């Protein structure tokens, strides 16, 4: 069939159907979303969970959610801005921080469900291929699928660092090693040591040493926060190892203290008077005026 020009006449506009709002905004891939949320028809009212990973300029968000008619329900969430509590105060958007955030959301949700003792995951981050095994007695491991949104799923992407952290934390997520750092597509071989370096921030440490030797001004500019906090390249591995231990020991989220609502809120405009208050103000104004007149008469 040849090229047919679209005639935008009355019939065209009468039948025109707009796409979903988030498709028009370019925020949601509904082709992928449909396959992530549609559950098997023989699993009645069984949620299909997703590990949602999103990156911003200064933060990493990891959420476990499932879909409902009224909208997605967030079961648990973790953010990289929580990592300073566990000892990681810089580099909150790199691969190592993504791994820590994924580990945090996994341990937090398993603790919430009471499965943290049953499924401890991989305690030492070594980059090896790991899949959680179901326990002989008790419930199965928590299963979810990775939701990357509109991100490119290239080999070594940070989104897979968050997924690896969640898997090592005890989640059952279907995956392979083909997208992890250290996988060679030509040789079809996986280097766990390369992946381990990324998990523990050793690739950042190597770049710090290299940049400091080649261009000190660029080093001072790019790693100013590291310098301010006194963190050198040799400290990174121990910093991330301690963070993993701290996350496992206490994944619970700190609740913000409730605001004291007993105090009256500050007003930026005059309070509206009631009818009785307005009448009383008129009476007071009349009395003051009469008193002033009497005072003038006495003087005269």
UniProtKB/Swiss-Prot annotation:
One of its GO terms (cellular component) is cytosolic large ribosomal subunit. Keywords: Cytoplasm, Nucleus, Ribonucleoprotein, Ribosomal protein, RNA-binding, rRNA-binding. It is found in: Cytoplasm; Nucleus. InterPro entries: Rbsml_uL18_euk, Ribosomal_uL18_C_euk. It comes from the Eukaryota. Residues 246-267 have a biased composition (Basic and acidic residues). GO terms for biological process: ribosomal large subunit assembly; translation. The keyword RNA-binding applies. GO terms for molecular function: 5S rRNA binding; structural constituent of ribosome. Residues 246-276 are annotated as: Disordered. Belongs to the universal ribosomal protein uL18 family. Component of the ribosome, a large ribonucleoprotein complex responsible for the synthesis of proteins in the cell. The small ribosomal subunit (SSU) binds messenger RNAs (mRNAs) and translates the encoded message by selecting cognate aminoacyl-transfer RNA (tRNA) molecules. The large subunit (LSU) contains the ribosomal catalytic site termed the peptidyl transferase center (PTC), which catalyzes the formation of peptide bonds, thereby polymerizing the amino acids delivered by tRNAs into a polypeptide chain. Component of the large ribosomal subunit (LSU). HAMAP family: Ribosomal_uL18_A. This is Large ribosomal subunit protein uL18. It comes from Toxoptera citricida.
């Amino acid at each position: 069939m040849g090229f047919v020009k679209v005639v935008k006449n009355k019939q065209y506009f009468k039948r025109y159907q707009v796409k979903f709002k988030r498709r028009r905004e370019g925020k949601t891939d509904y082709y992928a979303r449909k396959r992530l949320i549609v559950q098997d028809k023989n699993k009645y009212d069984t949620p299909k969970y997703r590990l949602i990973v999103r990156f911003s300029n200064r933060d990493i968000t990891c959420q476990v959610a499932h879909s409902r008619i009224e909208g997605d329900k967030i079961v648990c969430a973790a953010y990289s801005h929580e990592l300073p509590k566990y000892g990681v105060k810089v580099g909150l958007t790199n691969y190592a921080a993504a791994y820590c955030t994924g580990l945090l959301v996994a341990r937090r949700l398993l603790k919430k469900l009471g499965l943290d003792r049953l499924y401890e995951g991989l305690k030492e981050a070594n980059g090896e291929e790991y899949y959680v095994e179901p326990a002989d007695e008790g419930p199965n491991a928590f299963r979810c699928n990775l939701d990357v949104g509109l991100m490119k799923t290239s080999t070594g992407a940070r989104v897979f660092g968050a997924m690896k952290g969640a898997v090592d934390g005890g989640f059952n997520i279907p995956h392979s090693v083909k997208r992890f750092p250290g996988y060679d597509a030509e040789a079809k071989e996986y280097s766990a040591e390369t992946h381990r370096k990324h998990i523990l921030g050793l690739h950042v440490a190597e770049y710090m040493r290299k940049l400091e030797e080649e261009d000190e001004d660029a080093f001072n500019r790019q790693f100013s926060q590291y310098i301010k906090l006194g963190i050198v390249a040799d400290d990174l591995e121990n910093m991330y190892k301690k963070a993993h231990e701290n996350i496992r020991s206490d994944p619970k989220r700190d609740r913000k203290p409730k605001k004291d609502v007993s105090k009256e809120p500050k007003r930026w405009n005059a309070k509206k008077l009631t009818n009785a208050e307005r009448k009383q103000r008129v009476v007071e104004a009349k009395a003051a005026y009469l008193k002033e007149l009497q005072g003038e008469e006495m003087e005269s």
